[in-house]
C-alpha cells in the first residue's frame, strides 16, 4: 500500500478539483491511501469525500506554533509521495517538513515553493492558459496513472440530513442558486430578476438560494415557490443539496465546480474571469454551461439575458406563466 499526502489548504473550487483528481487516482490505484492537509473552514468537505482516508486540519490563525503542531502530526507518518497542489511558500514549507521519498509540486509554483520539491510537475501543453483541472491532472503520471478523470467524486452521507422540503408539491427537483461570491467583481446582481422569471415560468419548481453568507431578498416570492437558505448552508450539506437540484446556477465560485463534479446541470455566470480556464470542467460536457457577460462586465448582463439562455438549455418547453403574490405591498 502506497501513502500519498496531498497539500491543498484552499479554496473551495480548487479543493473540489483536487478531490476529483484524488478520486481518479483511487480508481486507478486502489491500494493507494490518501491523506490531505486542508484549512479548517474547508475540512468538512475533504473529510466527507470517500477518496480521502485521513485529514490534517490547518488553522491559519494559530500562527507558527500551530503550524509546527500540525507538521508534528504529519511527520508521524512516512509517506511515499507528497503532492503540493497549491504551490505557495506555506505549502512548500509543509512539503519540506513532511516525510516522503518523493515530493512533487507544480512547475509554476510561486514564492520560492519550488525549492522544496525533488520533482516538478510540468504544465499541460497550453501552459498557464490551461484549465485549473488540467494542471492538477498532470500530477497523475507521477504515480503511473493516466492524467484524466476516472470515476465520480463521492461523499459520505450526512446523518440526519433531510432535504425533502426542497421539492415542490409535485415532487419536482429545485433550481438551486448561489448568489454570493467572495470577490465583488465576480458577483452578479441579477439573481432576483432571474428568480422571479423562473418562478413564473409554470414549471412548478422551487427556487432555492443557498450559500454560507446571508443574502437578503425583500419582497421574495412565497415559500411555496422560493426558499432562502443563504447563511444557513453548511459545507458538509452542500453535496447533498446540490445533488437534489435539477439545475445549479451561480457565479464563478466553488459550488459551480462541485455541481459539475457531481454531474448536475450547471449554468455558470462569468464576468472578468475566463470560463475556458475557470469554468465547470469540462466545458464540453453536456451538463456544463456558462454565460459570459459582455466585455467581462457583469453589470452589462441582465436577468432577462440569463433567463433566455436558461430557458433554451432547459428544453424551451412552453409553459403557462403563473403570477405569484408580491410581498410588502
List each model region and its residues.
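Catalytic machinery of carbohydrate-active enzymes
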Residues: 1-329
